Amino acid sequence: TSAGTHPKLSPVLVTSADQAAKLFGVGSMLHAMLAAVKKANGYVETWALAAEDNESGQKAAATVTLSGSTTKSGTLWLYVGGVSVSCKVVAGEELSAVATRLASAVNADATLPVTAQAAEKAVTLTCRWAGLTGNDLDLRLNVYGEDTPAGLVATCTAFTGGTANPDVTDAIAAFGDEQWHGIVMPWTDAANMTALESELDLRWGPMKQAESIAFTAFRGTLGETSTHGNARNSHLVTCMGTGRSPTPPYIWAAVNAVTAIASLETDPARPLQTLALPGVIPPALPDRWTMEERNVLLHDGIATFMVQSGDVVAIERQVTMYQTNVWNMPDPSYLDVNTPATLGYIRYATRARILQKFPRHKLASDGTRFGPGQAIVTPSVIRGELLALYRELEEAGIVENFDQYKADLIVERNKDD
């Protein structure tokens, strides 16, 4: 928001929710994402980059309309993006008074993603920022089974009207040459996703070798989520389908990212299933997808979650969005996010070993005669170093089949360079 003190499009290390509030403004999307990240895991190094609203963007809005006649005093519990707002209700009072009090309660919480305006018997909630992400804000009553005061009826509409996400192109340019192991992407429109996927491919490629994995989330029906998954095909992007969760998709993506990266950085080959996503609220029981429905989503490039005892949301299977090869044939090569994570880890370990052991060495052919102490390395020496590294990775459970690797490994000088 405009209250943020940090310049736009400038990456900054963030260590706490309070710091995020100061840097990016209380109630901003980035503040909410970072607060969720630090609550889920405060030890993962996290950087943030703020972007401006699209100048042509519109803000999403929703309405709570009151009707009936309250016959018993109580409390009205409204949830905006999974965050509760409580409002006192007095038996027999005018509904306009309840609406005014509800709007005041919403505006009293500056961390909410919305502001409120009362008019007669209705309260209009408006997202603090412009863009499509505002349409994904959930608005409902009684998430945890609270009771609405007898006689009072509160009807919530869906958030609509948000248009035009920020253009991620400038943010991508601000990435620089730094390697970001996990990137949280809140904007899932086709244009922004295409731009990000292109950048990820460049970083994955041989010239940069600074691979990253992007984490996104999508809110919608089973059909809408399936369609979104089938429209993408990147092995470096994973998208969690949230269903009708009260928690916004951008929070899902942030918590999913920090949880997954904390595990992948420790052991990229270890599956992520059953890892809890702290602070994420599951859909209501009737809205949860069945196993058969989740299986459909997995085949459409959408990662799935499970709900454990106590309504704890956890990763079920973290697949990438990659589904078909260049011939449009089904290809499971990069099915799980662990595959690109493991490949990236192996490449990084290999580069690090060679750069550490032979940082400024001259390259000579095997059998070359040179004096002691010369900073010279030969293909056979490098081959031996790679085999030793593979043994270490094998002991760490990252790779297997050492004998096959040894037989297949060829290290030779480039005749043309």
Question: How should each PLM-predicted stretch be described?
Answer:
Residues 1-45, 274-288, 292-417:
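Structured, hydrophobic secondary-structure cores that serve as assembly/anchoring elements
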Residues 1-71, 75-84, 89, 150-176, ...:
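Structural signature of extracellular appendage/secretion-system components
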Residues 16-24, 69-140, 183, 201-202:
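Extended, beta-strand-rich, solvent-exposed assembly scaffolds of outer structural proteins
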Residues 29, 52-59, 102-111, 228-229:
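Short, solvent-exposed secondary-structure boundary motifs
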Residues 43, 111-122, 207-216, 398-408:
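Short glycine-rich, low-complexity/disordered patches
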Residues 45-53, 103, 118, 127-272:
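Extracellular Cys-Trp
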